[in-house]
């Protein structure tokens, strides 16, 4: 059923929104059928392989074609036209929002929403949000690593010994666009860390969008920067966000010593 919803969305021109909504619709209909449809004993074995998929695909397909298809097409076109019609100042604002939300919980459920939208826009041929997603995902681990280096230079220790070891692991993960490595570090000072990393990611997103950086590759970290439409601007955006994150962390985190 989910595959069929994707094909219907493509046929209608509903884009990624149509595929996403259609997939959820088919899934919930299948769940409803499984929980509420009673069949004879001899047909129970057919439920998971034939009855549920057939009925859910039929019902969801009819709803997509005749009820929600056209509104989704309109919403997809409106979103595409809105993104492509942004001026430079607006790009900075929306780039900041996309970047900040895309890493606010280090790859958790909140960041999945804007990242999914970026992936969908990539399917529509809009590559700038995808570049923000790739670059911003690297900022938390790189920014925290930079804050460790900066704190040593300024002789203001802000991380305990175990956190330092975790940062050594998080840094190479961050280069590969895996921001989850900073979660053990962030959990020790969650609010301050989230504020600093979200700000840094927002700066990266704003610079990237304003300078027109685009990425046709949805993942890969630093290894896909050469494939972006403006690699130098992408590198500038990444370094700027990293620097902002690191400086803010050194400024607002409390001094720590040893394994405190």
Model-derived features: positions:
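Pore-lining transmembrane helices
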Residues: 1-41, 49-259
